[in-house]
């Protein structure tokens, strides 16, 4: 990946359609200011990592989001599901079609690829939630992230919990 701030974005973006331009503008804004974006999980990708000292972790799993044409990948350790690697991968596979928030952390403009963090978006949500001063008995909007045969993982106010 090249340095984002060294790219000539006007040159790279001059032949984009209006939808592509809007997609990239949102990505640039998230990267520069750390503002969260939202998107639906379209799948889980597994990539082999070269030169890892621990061969049991020579593959990484990523949540994949494709808002329009750009592939946004969230590494397993940035999903927020890191009690155990097996649990993280199992939850990730159950998230197909789930809308999640994320913050762009790296951009590979030439390959239309970005890396993002759900954990950073959750930190922002937690700060915003704390400012609402929730009280016992208040109703709080909750989102179901994944459902398994014996449990459900939900998110509210930047916190994930198992039901």
What are these regions (language model features)?
Residues 1-163:
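Single-stranded RNA-binding regions, centering on S1/OB-family and related RNA-binding modules
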């Amino acid at each position: 990946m090249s340095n984002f701030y060294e790219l000539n974005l006007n040159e790279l973006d001059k032949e984009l359609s209006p939808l592509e331009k809007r997609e990239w503008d949102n990505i640039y804004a998230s990267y520069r200011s750390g503002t969260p974006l939202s998107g639906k999980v379209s799948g889980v990708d597994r990539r082999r990592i070269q030169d890892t000292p621990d061969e049991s972790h020579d593959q990484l799993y990523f949540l994949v989001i494709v808002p329009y044409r750009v592939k946004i990948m969230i590494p397993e350790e940035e999903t927020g599901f890191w009690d155990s690697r097996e649990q993280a991968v199992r939850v990730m596979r159950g998230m197909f079609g789930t809308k999640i928030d994320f913050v762009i952390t790296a951009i590979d403009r030439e390959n239309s690829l970005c890396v993002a963090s759900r954990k950073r978006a959750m930190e922002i949500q937690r700060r915003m939630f704390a400012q609402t001063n929730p009280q016992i008995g208040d109703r709080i909007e909750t989102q179901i992230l994944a459902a398994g045969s014996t449990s459900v993982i939900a998110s509210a106010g930047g916190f994930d919990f198992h039901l």
